[in-house]
Amino acid sequence: MTKLGTLYGISVGTGDPELITVKGLRILQRSQVVAFPVGKSGQAGMAEAIVASYLNPDQIRLPLNFPYVQDETVLTEAWDIAADQVWQYLKRGDDVSFACEGDISFYSTFNYLALTMRSRYPEF
């Protein structure tokens, strides 16, 4: 059986790419997959823009759609879809770094993704 990959939450700061931590950058660059929230209207989001110059051409970029709505049904469906997309890589042993603008420990998109992963995939 393949060892599961690791899901990392990477705080990428407030917009200046030089504010990412050295450790965060190291993990980001060694991960096979880099996930990030899609921006409004499907455009590049802030987190993607911050990390773009640090990514290698061979890394898989995984944009995840988290709608800007308050409808719990719509949000739950989006979290489930995102968790399923990330799981496809983790179960084959790939590490996934989730780039998140700001601080992942404070009201972060990453926390919702991690909670959904745990509920959908207990082995996670």
Regions found by a protein language model. Name each.
Residues M1-P17, V22-G24, Q29-F124:
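Class I S-adenosyl-L-methionine
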